[in-house]
C-alpha cells in the first residue's frame, strides 16, 4: 500500500473569465479559474496525490505548464494519463478522498457528478471515491472569494495484492 497527498490552488479571473470546472463538472458561476489547463483544482490535486503515492513526481513534471500541448487541457484527460502510469507501475486505486475549499460557489449540488466522473476516469467503484467541500468561514484568500483550493489523499494498492 502507498499513500499520496495532493494540493492545488487557482485564483479566479475577472467576471466572464471562462468556465469553472471542478471535478470534471462545469459549474455555473460568473468567474473561471486562471490556469494553463482548464484549472480543475480537484482533478489536479487528485492527479498529484496519485503521482506522489507512486513516487512519480507531480502533475507539473508529467504535464509541464511550459508545454503548449497542455494549454487549455482537459484535466480529466490528464488524470486518466496519470492513472495509466500508476497501473503500469503495478498499482491501482484503493480509495480517493478530496476536499474542495471554496467560499463560493456551493459545491454540494455538483458532488455526485464529480464522483461519477472520478470513478469513471479511475476505473473504480463510486464507493472508492469521496468528495466533500468546505469553506474557510470567510478567512484567507478562499474566504474572500479570490480562488479555490483543494486537497486530495489517495491510497494505492499493489495490483497483485488488491
Curated annotation (Swiss-Prot):
Cofactor-binding details, from the entry: Binds 1 divalent metal cation per subunit.
CDD domains with a match to the protein in the record: MECDP_synthase (cd00554)
Swiss-Prot/TrEMBL site (Transition state stabilizer) positions: 36, 135
Catalytic activity: 4-CDP-2-C-methyl-D-erythritol 2-phosphate = 2-C-methyl-D-erythritol 2,4-cyclic diphosphate + CMP
Required cofactor(s): a divalent metal cation
Uppermost EC category: lyase
InterPro entries in the cross-refs: MECDP_synthase, MECDP_synthase_CS, MECDP_synthase_sf
GO biological process, one term: isopentenyl diphosphate biosynthetic process, methylerythritol 4-phosphate pathway
Entry superkingdom: Bacteria
Keyword match Metal-binding: yes
One of the record's GO molecular function terms: 2-C-methyl-D-erythritol 2,4-cyclodiphosphate synthase activity
Entry's EC annotation: 4.6.1.12
Alphabetically ordered keywords of this record: Isoprene biosynthesis, Lyase, Metal-binding
Tagged with keyword Coiled coil: no
Quaternary structure and partners: Homotrimer.
Physiological role: Involved in the biosynthesis of isopentenyl diphosphate (IPP) and dimethylallyl diphosphate (DMAPP), two major building blocks of isoprenoid compounds. Catalyzes the conversion of 4-diphosphocytidyl-2-C-methyl-D-erythritol 2-phosphate (CDP-ME2P) to 2-C-methyl-D-erythritol 2,4-cyclodiphosphate (ME-CPP) with a corresponding release of cytidine 5-monophosphate (CMP).
PANTHER family reported for this sequence: 2-C-METHYL-D-ERYTHRITOL 2,4-CYCLODIPHOSPHATE SYNTHASE, CHLOROPLASTIC
Record-stated family: Belongs to the IspF family.
The protein, known as: 2-C-methyl-D-erythritol 2,4-cyclodiphosphate synthase
Organism this protein belongs to: Yersinia pseudotuberculosis serotype IB (strain PB1/+)
Gene: ispF
Amino acid at each position: 500500500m502507498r499513500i499520496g497527498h495532493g494540493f492545488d490552488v487557482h485564483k479566479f479571473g475577472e467576471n466572464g473569465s471562462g468556465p469553472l470546472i471542478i471535478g470534471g463538472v462545469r459549474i455555473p458561476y460568473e468567474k473561471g479559474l486562471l490556469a494553463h489547463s482548464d484549472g480543475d483544482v480537484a482533478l489536479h490535486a487528485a492527479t498529484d496525490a496519485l503521482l506522489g503515492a507512486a513516487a512519480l513526481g507531480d502533475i507539473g513534471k508529467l504535464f509541464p505548464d511550459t508545454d503548449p500541448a497542455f494549454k487549455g487541457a482537459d484535466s480529466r484527460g490528464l488524470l486518466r494519463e496519470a492513472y495509466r502510469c500508476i497501473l503500469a507501475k503495478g498499482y491501482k486505486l484503493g480509495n480517493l478522498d478530496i476536499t474542495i475549499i471554496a467560499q463560493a460557489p456551493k459545491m454540494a449540488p455538483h458532488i455526485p457528478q464529480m464522483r461519477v466522473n472520478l470513478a469513471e476516469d479511475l476505473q473504480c467503484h463510486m464507493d472508492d471515491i469521496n468528495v466533500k467541500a468546505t469553506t474557510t468561514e470567510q478567512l484567507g484568500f478562499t474566504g474572500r472569494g479570490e480562488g479555490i483550493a483543494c486537497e486530495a489523499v489517495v491510497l494505492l494498492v499493489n495490483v497483485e495484492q488488491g
